[in-house]
């Protein structure tokens, strides 16, 4: 349960949702606890006390002294960067003493291994990527349910993995399949996690301050794959394809790709455009049509004997209820993951047609006078906004800006030039966005509030356009969180609707 330690003394750093879950899990299994948080009274302190947990609490700045006094295991909450000025010396001190540093995902992996010794053998699906994680995770969970499996969805999507596992154990209802949304923060402190199937949806700049650079961020994403994990890879993303196993390796893990073009290799997925219809398709080797659906180690043989590939139509992309080409890619990834753990195709395709999407993720909240109002407040990085613009593939008035987290905004220029009628700029990093978009030829306007930006965008939009809130930035410079930003956007659209004599 805790590596080679029975009931170690654990230092839990950070008492957010994940830290609270770790503390409760460790206490449940007899560990002694020291809990530290930079806040003197973190909100979850009362919840931990109410749970009847015996622990020592230390509030205030972190210091290496926290690992003194018999600490045998350090648990790091995902919001805390090991590179942070106050945390790096503590982490270094722990490692110098040979004290393991785990995050919640490693505790979860160790727990599954311990349960496995008693015969519990669930399938585990893991989803990571800069954008699209929550949609793909929710959709994969639904698909597994439609295939008749008892499913637990947890991780970055909430609830915490250890809380969900505790609930399942207490209810004597352990799931057949775990579907986990995992952030780079969670993966960074994982060591033995090895899911049955996993995907990296995409890798673009995000959280560079936390990881110290893009290479470290991408490497953290790659920790989603264990030695035998089926790798579901986005072939349209060169950074993702760096994790493709070498074709010549005899012991290479299985791999399958998805993308927005036609797939060319047996078992891969993509889009076929025919007579004005885009189809979700699977590539099938005609000579091995009766082979199992799960991808095989085939790349080396294909080089010598190219297969006779046919494209099997799965469903029209327009039959999906989630809009945009990026969501077609998410759907293909979810389907590929479910197939990779051996689930039958028919119920999965029904699930794809059923899924309605997640709030604040390219969500059309209204259509007024032929103009779509689209809430993509969850689009907190450049890659998300590029995906929203290219995915919607319609003329748009974009509302963007906020806390840019040190990102390079230059990749926005091409899609803005292609799709945008105008861009409304808000928030702290509006000047940086203006500089990046200055040569696009698209009108740019600064606004002090989101409400003003929505009104200006509405006045400019033409029938067939979208007014798209996709900020490419975090929200905390102006709002409590991205959901609060979405609420303000919706309220502004509601006001416009009322003036037009209608409601949302």
From Swiss-Prot:
ATP binds at residues 129-135. Coiled coil: none annotated. Pfam families: Mur_ligase_C, Mur_ligase_M, MurD-like_N. Keywords: ATP-binding, Cell cycle, Cell division, Cell shape, Cell wall biogenesis/degradation, Cytoplasm, Ligase, Nucleotide-binding, Peptidoglycan synthesis. It is found in: Cytoplasm. GO terms for molecular function: ATP binding; UDP-N-acetylmuramoylalanine-D-glutamate ligase activity. The keyword Nucleotide-binding applies. Its main location: cytoplasm. One of its GO terms (cellular component) is cytoplasm. One of its GO terms (biological process) is regulation of cell shape. Its EC number is 6.3.2.9. It is an enzyme of class 6 (ligase). NCBIfam families: murD. This is UDP-N-acetylmuramoylalanine--D-glutamate ligase. It comes from Burkholderia pseudomallei (strain 668).
């Amino acid at each position: 349960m805790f590596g080679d330690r029975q009931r170690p003394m654990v230092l839990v750093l950070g008492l957010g949702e994940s830290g609270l879950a770790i503390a409760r899990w460790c206490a449940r299994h007899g560990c002694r606890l020291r809990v530290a948080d930079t806040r003197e009274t973190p909100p979850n302190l009362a919840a931990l006390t109410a749970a009847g947990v015996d622990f020592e609490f230390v509030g205030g700045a972190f210091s290496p002294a926290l690992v003194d006094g018999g600490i045998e295991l350090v648990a790091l909450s995902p919001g805390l960067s090991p590179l942070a000025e106050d945390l790096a010396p503590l982490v270094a001190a722990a490692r110098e003493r040979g004290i393991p540093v785990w995050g919640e995902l490693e505790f979860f992996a160790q727990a599954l291994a311990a349960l496995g010794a008693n015969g519990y053998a669930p399938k585990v699906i893991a989803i990571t990527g800069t954008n699209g994680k929550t949609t793909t995770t929710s959709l994969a969970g639904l698909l597994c349910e439609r295939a008749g499996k008892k499913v637990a969805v947890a991780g970055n999507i909430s609830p915490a993995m250890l809380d969900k596992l505790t609930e399942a154990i207490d209810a004597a209802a352990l799931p057949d399949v775990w579907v986990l949304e995992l952030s780079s923060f969670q993966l960074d402190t994982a060591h033995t996690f090895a899911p049955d199937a996993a995907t990296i949806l995409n890798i673009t700049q995000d959280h560079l301050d936390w990881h110290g650079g893009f290479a470290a961020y991408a490497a953290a994403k790659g920790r989603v794959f264990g030695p035998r994990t089926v790798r579901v890879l986005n072939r349209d993303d060169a950074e993702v394809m760096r994790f493709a196993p070498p074709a010549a390796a005899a012991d290479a893990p299985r791999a399958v790709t998805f993308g927005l073009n036609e797939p060319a290799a047996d078992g891969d997925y993509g889009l076929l455009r025919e007579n004005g219809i885009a189809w979700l398709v699977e590539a099938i080797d005609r000579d091995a049509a009766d082979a199992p659906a799960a991808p095989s180690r085939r790349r080396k043989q294909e080089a010598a004997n190219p297969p006779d590939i046919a494209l099997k139509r799965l469903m029209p992309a327009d039959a999906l209820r989630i809009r945009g080409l990026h969501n077609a890619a998410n759907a293909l990834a979810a389907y590929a993951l479910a197939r990779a753990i051996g689930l039958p195709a028919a119920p999965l395709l029904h699930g794809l047609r059923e899924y309605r999407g997640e709030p604040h993720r390219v969500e059309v909240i209204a259509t007024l006078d032929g103009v779509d109002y689209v809430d993509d407040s969850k689009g907190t990085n450049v890659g998300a906004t590029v995906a929203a613009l290219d995915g919607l593939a319609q003329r748009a008035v974009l509302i963007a800006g906020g806390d840019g987290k040190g990102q390079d905004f230059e990749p926005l220029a091409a899609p803005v030039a292609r799709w945008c009628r105008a861009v409304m700029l808000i928030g702290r990093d509006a000047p940086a966005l203006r500089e990046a978009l200055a040569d696009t030829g698209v009108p740019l306007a600064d606004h002090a509030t989101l409400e003003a930006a929505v009104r200006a965008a509405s006045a400019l939009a033409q029938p067939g356009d979208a007014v798209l809130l996709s900020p490419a930035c975090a929200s905390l410079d102006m709002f409590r969180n991205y959901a609060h930003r979405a609420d303000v956007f919706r309220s502004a659209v509601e006001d416009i609707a009322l003036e037009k004599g209608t409601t949302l």
